[in-house]
Design a protein with these regions (language model features):
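Compositionally biased terminal segments of proteins
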Residues: 1-138
């Protein structure tokens, strides 16, 4: 017989994003190789984290129950990952993905994560915002 399998909401959310053509293209076009293994580049991963945060925030605003830790985790991950960017990266992305990044950055800029709260030294919240803008909103 068939046995139902519980899939974590975070995995389900990521799967839904991957079914989107624009995000699938983002995944394919921003692959890198690490020791012969295909991985997603940092600049390619950040839009997925931002989109997950946007989707979860919209579900929460619509009255659905969402895991608050998951919402904050995606936002914090964007901050952590942004500290790895130099600012000159130019990820291949569609206008739809760019529009999502613009929406995310508008929300993020009004309430940025303090890198110090994530134990990241030597980088301020405004520097994170600026590098994200230079990479995704150029």
């Amino acid at each position: 017989g068939l046995m139902p399998i519980h899939i974590d909401d975070e995995v389900s959310n990521l799967s839904a994003i991957l079914l989107d053509d624009e995000y699938y293209r983002l995944l394919v076009e921003n692959r890198a190789s690490a020791s012969g293994v295909a991985v997603l580049s940092v600049e390619g991963l950040i839009p997925f984290k931002a989109k997950a945060w946007l989707d979860l925030s919209a579900r929460r605003a619509g009255g659905q129950a969402v895991d608050e830790k998951s919402v904050e985790k995606h936002r914090n991950d964007v901050c952590r990952l942004a500290t790895l960017l130099a600012g000159g990266e130019r990820p291949a992305m569609s206008e739809g993905v760019r529009a999502d990044m613009r929406r995310f950055l508008e929300a993020y800029e009004s309430d940025p994560v303090d890198p110090k709260a994530l134990k990241i030294k030597g980088v301020g919240a405004q520097q994170v915002v600026e590098v994200l803008k230079s990479v995704y909103l150029r």
